[in-house]
Amino acid sequence: MEDNLPVNVREYQELAKKALPKMAYDYINGGAEDEHTLRENIAAYTRIILRPRVLVDVSKIDMSTTLLGYTMRSPIIVAPTGGHKLAHPEGEKATARAAASCNAIMVLSFSSSCKIEDVASSCNAIRFYQLYVYKNRNVSATLVRRAESCGFKALLLTVDTPMLGRREADIRNKMVFPRSGNLEGLMTTDDHDTTNGSQLERFARATLDPSLSWKDIEWLKSITSMPIFLKGIVTAEDARRAVEAGVAGVIVSNHGARQLDYAPATIAALEEVVRAVAGAVPVLVDGGIRRGTDVFKALALGARAVMVGRPVFFGLAARGEAGARHVIEMLNGELEVAMALCGCRSVGEITRSHVMTEGDRIRSLL
């Protein structure tokens, strides 16, 4: 056991900032434009107060939950973030092993720096795959087939990126993204010309399809048997349309605040989406989760599970596979403590009555 291990996500972030080149750190940590939503994703959690119940026998805590019939040790999923080789030479393979050792589902990014096949063969685990639909539909279709043939269990379609958000740190740094193993043989990411700013931004303009619409859900369903989640839902209107489209679940996400600045913080949008879905499909949430108490708050507001991206990346950058694993373990440990101190023996016992939101406090004064 190493001495002086980080004891929270913030300390891992500080280590990652020291370990990474400025361009890489700014890429993973940055947000869109003024970064208001980036800050708010985290700050919104601080405005939710816990309401603990006491004199409950919490000698045994069960954090397990299920999603699509798969049992998870806890409701914490590793979110899709691109370019893990920016953080560690083993990239997503190291992250996959870390997740598997914690019995956590990992979602592999479309922008993975490791091949789908290499990640799949790195360890035995339940994995999902995150997809963008590109102008060249054959690229997306090929990736779906590869993921399905490698045993991935679900598809997460990102729906909030008809074009890339304006990430000013990447523009300023003239961000150059590493070769993506996912896209090898399909299209190139080798153009390193940064004359006009971010190479990533230029690549996205050339490939992302701004014409993507609800009718494309049917196309995607026609080419795969994997259940489909829509990632990037923040309104009741879109949540209801997602259910009508027959998807398997929705993910309340603002793309880590990297797309539209001044979009709502995800935890602030969660309850609206949960109410609109009305139990028809599971609702997941990502963005801003830095503590086990944040996970608890999301579950209390109706999320089936949460997805955590940047913290795992920070762990990978700071200490490799061991760091990524430790971040997941820390969050699990914090969640267990929060459950015990709130009188919840299982995630099923976490209810809306265990939290007070800012809106609740305002309504109580009327």
Curated annotation (Swiss-Prot):
Pathway: Lipid metabolism; fatty acid metabolism. It is found in: Peroxisome. It catalyses: a (2S)-2-hydroxycarboxylate + O2 = a 2-oxocarboxylate + H2O2. A 2-oxocarboxylate binds at Y27, Y132, R167, R258. The keyword RNA-binding does not apply. It is an enzyme of class 1 (oxidoreductase). It comes from the Eukaryota. Keywords: Fatty acid metabolism, Flavoprotein, FMN, Lipid metabolism, Oxidoreductase, Peroxisome. Pfam families: FMN_dh. CDD domains: alpha_hydroxyacid_oxid_FMN. Residues 1-360 form the FMN hydroxy acid dehydrogenase domain. The active site is at H255. GO terms for biological process: fatty acid metabolic process; photorespiration; regulation of photosynthesis; response to other organism; symbiont entry into host cell. SMART domains: IMPDH. The keyword DNA damage does not apply. A motif (Microbody targeting signal) lies at residues 364-366. GO terms for molecular function: (S)-2-hydroxy-acid oxidase activity; FMN binding. Belongs to the FMN-dependent alpha-hydroxy acid dehydrogenase family. This is Peroxisomal (S)-2-hydroxy-acid oxidase GLO4. It comes from Oryza sativa subsp. japonica (Rice).
